[in-house]
Amino acid sequence: LNGNTFELDMLAVSEDACYIIEIKSKYRKDDLKQLLKHIEKYKINTPEHKNKKIFGVIVATDFNKENIKELAKKGVYFISVSDDIIKLHQPEGFNPFAW
């Protein structure tokens, strides 16, 4: 991106939004910090998407309910994966934050 490189686990782009997705086997608090750094780098290095909302998403197989609450407070989507079930967690009052 503009001569700068960094790795994203996954990126989804729609007409009016971008979703930066971190995929982890075990969620750790540092994963949120990493996601936020990736969002900032993406915003700086993709002027073609400057008018799009940017959302953060973390996907993990190993997590606890406190992780879901913490991410919800930050406005970050959380998706869990177990066996053959994929679930988007949106606790009551969840408001996704757009960067």
Language-model regions: role of each:
Residues T5, D30, E66:
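Charged, alpha-helix-enriched surfaces in structured cytosolic catalytic cores
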Residues I23, I39-K41, P47-N51, D83-L88:
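Short, surface-exposed, polar/charged, turn-prone segments marking secondary-structure boundaries
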Residues L8-D31, L35-L36, E40:
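Conserved catalytic cores of phosphodiester-cleaving nucleases, focusing on short active-site segments
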Residues L1-N2:
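A short acidic/basic microdomain associated with nuclease active sites
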